[in-house]
Curated annotation (Swiss-Prot):
GO cellular component: cytosolic small ribosomal subunit
Keyword hit for Lyase: no
SUPFAM superfamilies: Ribosomal protein S18
The keyword rRNA-binding is assigned to this record: yes
InterPro entries for the chain: Ribosomal_bS18 (IPR001648), Ribosomal_bS18_CS (IPR018275), Ribosomal_bS18_sf (IPR036870)
Alphabetical keyword list: Ribonucleoprotein, Ribosomal protein, RNA-binding, rRNA-binding
GO MF annotations in UniProt: small ribosomal subunit rRNA binding; structural constituent of ribosome
Gene3D superfamilies, alphabetized: Ribosomal protein S18
PANTHER family in UniProt: 30S RIBOSOMAL PROTEIN S18, SMALL RIBOSOMAL SUBUNIT PROTEIN BS18M
Higher taxonomy: Bacteria, Bacillati, Cyanobacteriota, Cyanophyceae, Synechococcales
Quaternary structure annotation from Swiss-Prot or TrEMBL: Part of the 30S ribosomal subunit. Forms a tight heterodimer with protein bS6.
HAMAP family assigned: Ribosomal_bS18
Stated role: Binds as a heterodimer with protein bS6 to the central domain of the 16S rRNA, where it helps stabilize the platform of the 30S subunit.
Protein name in the entry: Small ribosomal subunit protein bS18
Amino acid sequence: MPNSIFKKQLSPIKPGDPIDYKDVELLKKFITERGKILPRRMTGLTSKQQRDLTLAVKRARIVALLPFVNPEG
């Protein structure tokens, strides 16, 4: 599909690097302006990295480092 809607981006996370829920700047790269977690086909992460990312985003939301939804988006 040459005219794909989703452009795969290179992951800023190397395999084996930990994904910390306190690293808000890194987590913001993987959520939309509305606060939704981007799918793996858009992030270019491995499946384990995507699971770790999802867990980190959810933890960051619980401790109020990230919003659950962005009302301006």
